[in-house]
């Protein structure tokens, strides 16, 4: 699977761009603020419905324009698909797939599985549990057909339960919500546990290659006491939840922890080592998807050289080449990505939102 063409209109500082892309490595070179990260963000937005640097639509729409428009062509294993997304300043989205409107953003995500590696991506390791839940949920979304519907319903019921907690006086008034919520919560938790167990060996193998000096352990925490039934716990915790005004325990508190010698990796590893670990997690997840479903991820790597010395850059470059996936890499100069440049690569020069193809001779 590869994105063969990308059209960008009024996104960030890019007025208009029409890019013919290659299945291997696509390099974006330019000074800071030139717009190279905006290209990566446009691809990410086409696959997620939102940008990775801002959740507000108005901030990614070019100045004085009413909306941004993105189009892409995806070369799949059997057919070519056409996808499109537009969003106005009020946040209203339109999704088009193969010429027809009325589709959902989740359908774009299924067609364009994307792994993102950015300088801000350390939050996967040193940020709150929500970032690691998102990591697990990405895998469950692409591996369990019923996951997204169950997850969406669970989130809706959690919101309704939290609102009800601020109005009810005894647990019986919540029972109707919990009878719906508990089966979904347990199913989501089981899917996450199964996925984390299934991918652990892939992560460990990649980490052994990237960080052989560390022995890492992985553990999934479902968000409530493993000895307790969730239905019983919710009833037992009612008074506490009512005082708090929200549900304190459940799958919305789940986490996926990584340790070395019993210590959290964020407290032991250097920033360069943490970046390699982050890359290992993203690569392992993408390779697991390929093995399970035959789908290849798109890898978006912003500021490739950040935190990595030349040895580590070569290591990451070789591993990315081995995936045979489509890779988009941004860098300030061509020298920073010389370890990646090969016969299957295409280089773009980005200057003040203008994108041109650059010869690699």
UniProtKB/Swiss-Prot annotation:
PANTHER family: DNA REPLICATION AND REPAIR PROTEIN RECF. One of its GO terms (molecular function) is ATP binding. It is found in: Cytoplasm. Keywords: ATP-binding, Cytoplasm, DNA damage, DNA repair, DNA replication, DNA-binding, Nucleotide-binding, SOS response. It comes from Pectobacterium atrosepticum (strain SCRI 1043 / ATCC BAA-672). Belongs to the RecF family. This is DNA replication and repair protein RecF. The RecF protein is involved in DNA metabolism; it is required for DNA replication and normal SOS inducibility. RecF binds preferentially to single-stranded, linear DNA. It also seems to bind ATP. It comes from the Bacteria. Disulfide bonds: none annotated.
């Amino acid at each position: 699977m590869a994105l063969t063409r990308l059209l960008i209109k009024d996104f960030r500082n890019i007025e208009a761009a029409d890019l013919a892309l290659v299945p291997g490595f696509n390099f974006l070179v330019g000074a800071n603020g030139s717009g190279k990260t905006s290209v990566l963000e446009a691809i990410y937005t086409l696959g997620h419905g939102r940008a990775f640097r801002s959740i507000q639509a108005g901030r990614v729409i070019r100045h004085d324009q009413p909306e941004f428009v993105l189009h892409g062509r995806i070369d799949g294993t059997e057919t070519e698909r056409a996808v499109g997304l537009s969003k106005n300043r009020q946040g209203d989205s339109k999704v088009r797939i193969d010429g027809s409107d009325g589709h959902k953003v989740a359908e774009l995500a299924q067609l364009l599985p994307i792994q993102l590696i950015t300088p801000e991506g350390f939050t996967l390791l040193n940020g709150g549990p929500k970032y690691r839940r998102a990591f697990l949920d990405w895998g469950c979304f692409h591996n369990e057909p019923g996951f997204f519907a169950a997850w969406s319903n669970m989130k809706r019921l959690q919101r309704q339960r939290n609102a009800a907690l601020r109005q009810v006086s005894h647990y019986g008034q919540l029972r109707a919500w919990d009878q719906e919520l508990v089966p979904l919560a347990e199913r989501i938790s089981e899917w996450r546990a199964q996925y984390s167990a299934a991918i652990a060996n892939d992560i460990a193998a990649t980490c052994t290659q990237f960080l052989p000096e560390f022995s890492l352990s992985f553990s999934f925490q479902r968000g409530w006491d493993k000895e307790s039934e969730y239905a019983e716990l919710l009833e037992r915790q009612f008074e506490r939840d009512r005082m708090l005004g929200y549900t304190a325990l459940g799958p919305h508190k789940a986490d996926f922890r990584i340790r070395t010698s019993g210590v959290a990796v964020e407290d032991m590893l250097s920033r360069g080592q943490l970046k390699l670990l982050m890359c290992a997690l993203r690569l392992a997840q993408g390779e697991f998807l390929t093995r399970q479903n035959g789908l290849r991820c798109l890898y978006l790597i912003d500021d490739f050289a950040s935190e990595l010395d030349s040895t580590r850059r070569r290591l990451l470059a070789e591993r990315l080449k081995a995936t045979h996936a489509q890779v988009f890499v941004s860098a300030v100069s061509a020298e920073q990505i010389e370890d990646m440049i090969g016969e299957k690569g295409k280089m773009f020069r980005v200057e003040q939102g203008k994108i041109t193809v650059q010869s690699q001779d």
